[in-house]
């Protein structure tokens, strides 16, 4: 038995200079797992709660000492002597100990850090890589794939201090034969984009996720500049590389309207969906995330009706990795894909349940980082171990993003042909 003999929590720093929770789980025999919870900027209102201290004299109120104390006291006491390989049991113990719908007693950041650390400790105990352990927990042992990266090379919205309303403009190197080749293509486009921006006299500073954050006249301008960079890098837009957007529309939804302040346009719900469709008619956009507010379910039905057969429509703030909300979406034919973020739901077991539910309903599942990240690369193993097929982990700079890409390179090297890179086939509506 992989007996837990100690659980340790500590406060560490995330990529935005804010505190977050790191946990260690120690087993008999010297096996140790360590993991850290990420943190979001544009967050869904129904996400599990990230417990912050609120003490303005420390880290401007963003300290996590209360969550850390919960790890070192209540959670530690509850898990001592338990089997680390029994992931579902461990997670349920913590969920029951918390006893709230959104984990606001112990904090989703506390529970998640321990949940992931336990999985890493269990993998070490079994002598297998984390992705292999996750595949076993998922009921799909040995079934792997390398994910298509959605590379966020131009940032706006809550991730950048500029006038661009849409939060993420991403490239997907779908024409690559391997993940390694896809990463190289993305890096070359990223560096070429820097040159294009520089030559136009535009800012080459980066946002939270490592993408460039220039001021632009319109959201369409962002797509035009990326198109220029893709072609200048020697690739063909539409076959070698496709585009994806994360609108994070909840962030500019005001009084029932979608207010694109950066370009001075205001849309009603259907009008904004029509606007997005017009962009997709001009450029090879194959995936749109959070194209409407999380509460605008009638609008989502219309958006799915007009674009859902050809474009992947991803629910992030809409579904918040929550099976109860996803069930409603599936029953009502809302969207056709879910974004998967560990900390929206707060445990590995619940995360795997959301991925499984999505796949069984014919939805795709896109594994994602948060804008506040650490060097923890667990999402790379999650993407491969569940054969999710797609990953969002930022741009090609900032080591908090690149850590995930580097872990994927290592995994591909280990697995070779056992983890195929399927390109466009992974994206809903493109197979």
UniProtKB/Swiss-Prot annotation:
GO cellular component: cell surface; extracellular region; phosphopyruvate hydratase complex
Catalyzed chemical reaction(s): (2R)-2-phosphoglycerate = phosphoenolpyruvate + H2O
Keyword Transcription regulation on entry: no
Documented EC number(s): 4.2.1.11
Any single GO BP term: glycolytic process
Pfam family name, one: Enolase_C
Protein name: Enolase
Family (UniProt): Belongs to the enolase family.
Subunit and interaction comment: Component of the RNA degradosome, a multiprotein complex involved in RNA processing and mRNA degradation.
Enzyme's top EC category: lyase
Gene: eno
Active site, per annotation: 209 (proton donor), 341 (proton acceptor)
Cofactor binding note of this UniProt entry: Binds a second Mg(2+) ion via substrate during catalysis.
Cofactor: Mg(2+)
